[in-house]
């Protein structure tokens, strides 16, 4: 947990002259770079306007909302705060439980993408459970399409657990309609499960329109168990993922938005976002 003093210090650290440098990919066709606000969830709760301003000052241009934000303020209030900071909000996360009730909120927020954050553990422990999730995703995908939005699901590592020679992820991709259901690939959790993000982009690029970018520390064994032992987060460029290949392929495959996310940080989150942004500029230059 970070104190208010740490938050302010981190914010000031983020507002360096280096942060005023133009985006390295401004002249490229690379997707806009944004932040998944779960990274700064405590700071958002304490000072939404200040946190959004700090994100914008670093150089990020978009944000993605996290699940519990829909329960804390109206869509109109949240949209105004984001717009006032000079940011856009093309995508938002909502929990599987209660997802049905969030479409109007998402529309009022102006989202292009409505994303289910995860398959609940209560059903994500069997192949039948993933089949049920796939059916639900198709239903939500159809509803999103009717409302002018695109549905997607976000992965962790547990989707890659094996059931009689197949995986939960395989079942989700096989049983969902590509016209209705997109996949928001979280590069970290793919790697944590022992898979390769680049290979996934090659195979499923036609179904990936948004990405989560987070890096993974060296030395940790892969795992498909979603728990504290599977959390080896670090800033983009400070870990083991091959970002040059991932980013180039994402651009080639037509990914539309990329969101930096770091579930936990060892320094103030704004400082971590600054480091990831600076490293991404070098990678994309």
Model-derived features: where do they sit?
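Catalytic domains of carbohydrate-active enzymes, especially glycoside hydrolases
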Residues: 51-68
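C-terminal segment of N-terminal export signals and the immediately downstream linker at the start
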Residues: 22-46, 54
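Active-site acidic/histidine proton-transfer and metal-coordination neighborhood
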Residues: 19, 52, 88-182, 270
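Glycine-rich, proline-tolerant flexible connector loops at the mouths of alpha/beta enzymes
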Residues: 64-79
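Short, acidic/polar
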Residues: 43-54, 97-105, 194-200, 243
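N-terminal secretory signal peptides and thylakoid transit peptides that target proteins
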Residues: 1-15
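Acidic/histidine-rich catalytic cores of soluble enzymes
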Residues: 146-240, 247
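Conserved, mostly hydrophobic/aromatic
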Residues: 35, 55, 63, 82, ...
